[in-house]
């Protein structure tokens, strides 16, 4: 919409450059494979299994195949052709073992063929065959999960869409305790995806996973650090440098994950400088980031401890509480106090070498002098449980906890909520959990879901319980999903097929981030030029049409979960008629929702354009101008905004001139 000639030609030029680069890369890879295949054809005799191979037991053949693969793929002085020969020999060993009903061989072959491991071209037909053999041989939960996945996605003609079979396979896996199967069933029941909508079924499966995770991951202890500071989910690939489907203009750039990545990139730039020259606000953010951890920046409590200490010393340079640096800026004092609170929590709740109650108390006392809420909570917790030399003092503990609650501290809100729950003051407990949830306390999601499920302090609501259980499950299980592997496959190895499959697997479990990435990888309209061609009825192939339909479906699913970029993308799909008939009214609604929920400038821009030209709206240049005026506070929109307003003025004069001529 409103495409300039310059943008058109730049986009076209970049697309041609990318096409040439991909062609050369593909040609190089193809020549390498052809040369390797010629070498293999000339040495085919060495790949034929001997009588000795067949004399071995199936288990020995599997073991030898794995040793061959491990050895040749770890050696640096072996030629590529030799690796291919030995790889094929190993696969033949696995195939012979699978024919003798060895279930390990079936599993290895299924994964190799499906995910294209060891540089094998993925063969969906073979992978379906081996997964099917495996689940029939021993009822493997993993094989049943994969068969359910095949049937739920119409992944190929070898396993067409069959919701009934998908459900059967997942239920078989769920009965064996597979958390993936429970998550598949929960999400599909929740949104009526290829099965009847059922809040009761959804909550049943989500509750099973939540209870399991709460016991295994949190140890039924709300002070477990991985639950206090959950992992940041930075598994996004979509867009330039993972910035979101619209690059720098994406709503994703305002997310916690992107802000964490931005902090990490600043940190990497600062590493070349002496630590004394660092910006202390950045140091504080990096320390917090190390508490949570993320795919590209794992958690490290020791590093957090060092950085927080460094920040705290900017106000308390010595061990004495009264020894402070005069004329310290208030911003540094605030960071130093917050650092003390984090240090106290680390020493109090760590299960490793950082655990030290005396140090925790010392840090909390410092932070409390500057009204740090974590420090109030820590001192209150220790007094309530008698963890200091003064023994149990619940009155003092509650007084300090309430000070933290007044500052909306999520840990204190949870602590007080649990106390109210024990006292059977259910309504108060429910509202405290709700307040903690607004502060993104992961543990509170579990307790809120329990409240809705049991009708504790609020009316029963299976849909609300399902949604909160879902938030808890997805926060705790994120690192155990296939999204991390998906990002690695595409970032490290450039295997788009494998990455797509991994994202698709997580998408079927209900992760909105996986849904938008699966859609993006299948999206034929990543660039503006693609959408313009579609707008003017550009002829497309059957494959492109199938890709459009797939992308539309998964963008729609992510949009239904509240992903702003997906909502905006859906607006584009309705506007240009991609994967769905053109519907300007729905497009306008999507742009409006995207703007209202995130203040994304492009939404307002497109709404103004539609009003200016009367597309799906009554033509009204005055409304268009008013909408554009709202963008004036956005620095990134300054120049295009001035151009657009200038053009609107010209357009307005043109319309007035036409009216004048008609009057004559």
Curated annotation (Swiss-Prot):
<dbReference type="GO" id="GO:0005789">
    <property type="term" value="C:endoplasmic reticulum membrane"/>
</dbReference>
<feature type="repeat" description="Sel1-like 3">
    <location>
        <begin position="337"/>
        <end position="372"/>
    </location>
</feature>
<dbReference type="InterPro" id="IPR011990">
    <property type="entry name" value="TPR-like_helical_dom_sf"/>
</dbReference>
<feature type="repeat" description="Sel1-like 8">
    <location>
        <begin position="601"/>
        <end position="636"/>
    </location>
</feature>
<feature type="repeat" description="Sel1-like 6">
    <location>
        <begin position="442"/>
        <end position="477"/>
    </location>
</feature>
<keyword id="KW-0325">Glycoprotein</keyword>
<feature type="repeat" description="Sel1-like 2">
    <location>
        <begin position="179"/>
        <end position="214"/>
    </location>
</feature>
<dbReference type="InterPro" id="IPR050767">
    <property type="entry name" value="Sel1_AlgK"/>
</dbReference>
<feature type="repeat" description="Sel1-like 7">
    <location>
        <begin position="564"/>
        <end position="599"/>
    </location>
</feature>
<dbReference type="GO" id="GO:0036503">
    <property type="term" value="P:ERAD pathway"/>
</dbReference>
<feature type="signal peptide">
    <location>
        <begin position="1"/>
        <end position="35"/>
    </location>
</feature>
<feature type="glycosylation site" description="N-linked (GlcNAc...) asparagine">
    <location>
        <position position="371"/>
    </location>
</feature>
<feature type="glycosylation site" description="N-linked (GlcNAc...) asparagine">
    <location>
        <position position="221"/>
    </location>
</feature>
<feature type="glycosylation site" description="N-linked (GlcNAc...) asparagine">
    <location>
        <position position="537"/>
    </location>
</feature>
<keyword id="KW-0677">Repeat</keyword>
<dbReference type="InterPro" id="IPR006597">
    <property type="entry name" value="Sel1-like"/>
</dbReference>
<keyword id="KW-0732">Signal</keyword>
<protein>
    <recommendedName>
        <fullName>Uncharacterized Sel1-like repeat-containing protein C1B3.10c</fullName>
    </recommendedName>
</protein>
<feature type="glycosylation site" description="N-linked (GlcNAc...) asparagine">
    <location>
        <position position="454"/>
    </location>
</feature>
<feature type="repeat" description="Sel1-like 1">
    <location>
        <begin position="141"/>
        <end position="178"/>
    </location>
</feature>
<comment type="similarity">
    <text>Belongs to the sel-1 family.</text>
</comment>
<feature type="glycosylation site" description="N-linked (GlcNAc...) asparagine">
    <location>
        <position position="138"/>
    </location>
</feature>
<feature type="repeat" description="Sel1-like 5">
    <location>
        <begin position="410"/>
        <end position="441"/>
    </location>
</feature>
<feature type="repeat" description="Sel1-like 4">
    <location>
        <begin position="373"/>
        <end position="409"/>
    </location>
</feature>
<dbReference type="Pfam" id="PF08238">
    <property type="entry name" value="Sel1"/>
</dbReference>
<feature type="glycosylation site" description="N-linked (GlcNAc...) asparagine">
    <location>
        <position position="101"/>
    </location>
</feature>
<feature type="glycosylation site" description="N-linked (GlcNAc...) asparagine">
    <location>
        <position position="300"/>
    </location>
</feature>
């Amino acid at each position: 919409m409103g495409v300039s000639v310059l943008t058109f030609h730049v986009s076209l030029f970049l697309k041609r450059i990318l096409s040439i680069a991909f062609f050369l890369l593909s040609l190089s890879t193809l020549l390498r494979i052809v040369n390797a295949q010629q070498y293999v054809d000339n040495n085919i005799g060495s790949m034929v299994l001997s009588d000795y191979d067949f004399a071995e037991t199936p288990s020995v053949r599997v073991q030898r195949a794995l040793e061959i693969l491990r050895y040749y793929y770890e050696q640096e002085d072996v030629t590529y052709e030799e690796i291919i020969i030995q790889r094929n020999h190993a696969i033949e060993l696995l195939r012979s073992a699978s024919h003798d009903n060895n279930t390990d061989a079936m599993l290895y072959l299924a994964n190799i063929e499906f995910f294209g491991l060891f540089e094998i071209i993925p063969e969906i037909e073979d992978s379906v065959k081996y997964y099917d053999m495996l689940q029939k041989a021993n009822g493997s939960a993993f094989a049943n999960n994969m068969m359910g996945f095949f049937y739920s996605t119409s992944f190929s003609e070898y396993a067409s869409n069959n919701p009934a079979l998908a459900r059967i396979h997942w239920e078989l896996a769920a009965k064996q305790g597979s958390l993936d199967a429970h998550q598949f069933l929960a999400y599909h029941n929740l949104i009526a995806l290829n099965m009847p909508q059922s809040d009761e079924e959804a909550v049943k499966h989500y509750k099973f996973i939540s209870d399991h995770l709460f016991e295994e991951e949190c140890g039924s202890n709300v002070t477990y650090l991985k639950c206090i500071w959950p992992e940041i989910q930075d598994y996004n690939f979509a867009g330039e440098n993972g910035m979101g489907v619209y690059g720098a203009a994406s709503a994703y750039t305002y997310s916690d994950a992107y802000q964490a990545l931005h902090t990490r990139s600043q940190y990497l730039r600062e590493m070349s400088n002496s630590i004394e020259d660092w910006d202390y606000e950045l140091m504080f953010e990096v320390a917090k980031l190390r508490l949570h951890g993320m795919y590209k920046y794992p958690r490290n409590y020791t590093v957090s401890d060092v950085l927080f200490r460094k920040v705290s010393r900017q106000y308390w340079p010595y061990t004495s509480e009264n020894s402070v640096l005069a004329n310290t800026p208030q911003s540094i004092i605030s960071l130093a106090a917050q650092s003390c609170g984090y240090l106290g929590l680390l020493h109090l709740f760590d299960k490793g070498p950082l655990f030290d109650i005396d140090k925790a108390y010392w840090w909390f006392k410092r932070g409390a002098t500057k009204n740090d809420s974590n420090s109030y909570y820590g001192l209150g917790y220790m007094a309530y449980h008698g963890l200091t030399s003064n023994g149990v003092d619940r009155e003092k503990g509650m007084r300090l906890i309430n000070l933290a609650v007044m500052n909306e501290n999520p840990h204190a809100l949870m602590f007080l909520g649990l106390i109210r729950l024990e006292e059977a003051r259910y309504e108060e407990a429910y509202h405290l959990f709700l307040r903690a949830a607004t502060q993104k306390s992961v543990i509170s999601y579990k307790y809120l879901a329990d409240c809705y499920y049991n009708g504790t302090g609020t009316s029963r609501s299976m849909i609300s319980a399902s949604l909160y259980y879902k938030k808890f499950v997805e926060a705790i299980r994120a690192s155990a999903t296939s999204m991390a592997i998906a990002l690695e496959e595409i970032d490290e190895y450039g295997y788009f097929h494998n990455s797509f499959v991994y994202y698709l697997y997580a998408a079927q479990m209900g992760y909105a981030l996986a849904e938008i990435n699966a859609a993006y990888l299948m999206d034929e309209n990543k660039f503006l030029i693609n959408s313009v061609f579609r707008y003017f009825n550009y002829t497309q192939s059957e494959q492109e049409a199938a890709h459009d339909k797939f992308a539309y479906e998964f963008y729609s699913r992510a949009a239904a979960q509240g992903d702003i970029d997906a909502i905006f993308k859906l607006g584009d799909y309705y506007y240009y008629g991609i994967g769905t008939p053109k519907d300007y009214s729905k497009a306008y609604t999507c742009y409006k929702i995207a703007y209202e929920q995130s203040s994304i400038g492009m939404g307002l821009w497109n709404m103004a354009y539609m009003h200016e030209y009367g597309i799906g709206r009554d033509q009204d240049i005055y409304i268009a101008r008013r909408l554009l005026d709202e963008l004036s506070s956005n620095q990134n929109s300054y120049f295009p905004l001035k151009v657009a307003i200038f053009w609107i003025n010209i357009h307005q004069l043109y319309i007035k001139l036409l009216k004048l001529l008609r009057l004559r």
